[in-house]
Design a protein with these regions (language model features):
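C-terminal hydrophobic helical "lid"/dimerization subdomain
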Residues: 1, 240-241, 271-275, 279, ...
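Glycine-rich cofactor phosphate-binding loops and adjacent beta1-alpha1 units
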Residues: 182-185, 224-309, 374-375
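Cysteine-cluster motifs in flexible loop/terminal segments that predominantly coordinate metals
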Residues: 88-150
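Residues in the short beta-alpha loop(s) of Rossmann-like NAD(P)-binding domains
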Residues: 11, 220, 289, 316
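Cytochrome P450 core scaffold surrounding the K-helix E-X-X-R motif
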Residues: 42-48
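Mid-domain Rossmann-like dinucleotide-binding core that forms the NAD(H)/NADP(H) cofactor-binding site
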Residues: 143, 150-152, 156-244
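Redox-cofactor binding/interface segments in oxidoreductases and associated redox assembly factors
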Residues: 35, 86, 192, 259-260, ...
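Glycine-rich beta-strand-centered segment in the early N-terminal region that forms part
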Residues: 23-37, 50-99, 104, 112-114, ...
Length: 375
């Protein structure tokens, strides 16, 4: 079928809305009419080259929600009409890693940046006669998708699509970073560096886990104000102010848990984050930096002598098939505020405006909302 999508053809160029050709679902694949797509900072890394796909052109988007329209042979637990969220981490349930309970590290994830379909190794999308590389095997910046069933999670049909799309990456990653990877305990003090979409979800996780003080650090004043509304007890504009402020509030003990959710992580800054981490504390690396940034600035002696932990995480250490419906159930019960995380909704043609707003610090999360006019 012919549809359209937001493509990039080379680094540091704007998104281009173009006609694309999309194949039908084959064995184990699902066709989805997209209703909403989250605008995550990771897709901007595609533009800058921080996350390079295996080739060009690239179809962006890895947060999305929609309605199943067709399924291929071998798909038994998903049917046309189902409302679904796309998980940027596939979860086969069969590989050794999934069997060990680490579905966020599914072996299918090895192909996230390769572009070829998991099902048969071919390319399902073409543009201008060339194969298209969809972001994390998804490509939610298009009103239609054909994806492997391992990336599809059924959800409660009463959840609004513009909210549901957030749990495909940002919310699940942030919330899980707090309650799973950081394992925040009641009464602990927590610092969250960067309070965009992922950071605001981590903040809500810290609140739910019973943190005593929650320190939110962000250079954008509006985001700091929003962080206070979401449950932060103290806010700071930069690491220098945070170092002094956290030391004063905790009498020099610092934060038991630090969660890094900045827009772009830099190895040179890691030591400043460890400096606000308490003795025996954990600094969780949730944010992603450039794949070319291989140098990390750490005082190894202090890391050892203070017994601090520097812990990486992907998808917040969660299980897509469990965590996505669970977080949406919490939303339905009024225990998770997702409505206020959607700052602005855009048309697909406004994608460059949306990313400009993100870079200017105007959004917690921007969302592309599809209409019949897009199809």
């Amino acid at each position: 079928m012919k549809t359209k999508g937001a493509l990039i053809w080379e680094f540091n160029q704007p998104w281009s809305i173009e006609e694309i050709d999309m194949g039908d679902p084959v064995k184990d694949e699902v066709k989805i009419q997209m209703e909403a797509a989250g605008m995550c900072h990771s897709d901007h890394h595609l533009v800058t080259g921080g996350i390079p796909m295996a080739g060009f052109p690239v179809l962006g988007g890895h947060e999305g929600a929609g309605i199943v329209t067709e399924v291929g042979p071998g798909v038994e637990d998903i049917a046309p009409g189902d409302h679904v969220v796309l998980s940027f981490i596939p979860s086969c349930g069969k590989c050794p890693t999934c069997q060990a309970g680490m579905r966020n590290l599914c072996d299918l994830g090895a192909g996230l940046l390769a572009g070829a379909a998991v099902s048969d190794g071919t390319f399902r999308i073409q543009a201008r006669g060339q194969n298209v590389y969809p972001m994390t095997l998804l490509g939610t910046f298009s009103p239609y998708m054909v994806v492997h069933k391992s990336s599809v999670v059924k959800i409660d049909p009463s959840v609004p699509f513009e909210v549901a799309c957030l749990v495909g990456c940002g919310v699940t990653t942030g919330y899980g970073s707090a309650v799973r990877t950081a394992d925040i305990r009641p009464g602990q003090d927590v610092a969250i560096v960067g309070v965009g979409g992922v950071g605001m979800a981590a903040l809500q996780g810290a609140v739910a886990a019973g943190a005593r003080y929650i320190f939110a650090i962000d250079p954008v004043e509006w985001k700091r104000d929003q962080a206070l509304k979401f449950g932060a007890t103290h806010v700071y504009p930069d690491m220098e102010a945070a170092l002094l402020g956290i030391a004063e509030v905790t009498y020099g003990l610092m934060a038991h848990k630090v969660i890094l959710t900045v827009g772009e992580l830099k190895g040179a800054d890691i030591d400043s984050y460890l400096n606000i981490t308490a003795k025996g504390g954990t600094c969780v690396v949730t944010a992603i930096g450039s794949l070319l940034d291989t140098q990390v600035n750490v005082n190894l002696a202090m890391l050892t002598l203070m017994q601090k932990n520097l812990q990486g995480t992907i998808f917040g250490g969660g299980n897509p098939q469990y965590d996505i419906p669970q977080l949406l159930a919490m939303y339905k019960a009024g225990k998770l505020n997702l409505d206020d995380m959607v700052t602005t909704q855009y048309k697909l043609e406004q994608i460059n405006d949306g990313y400009r707003d993100m870079l200017d610090g105007k959004n917690i999360r921007g969302v592309i909302r599809y209409t019949d006019a897009d199809r």
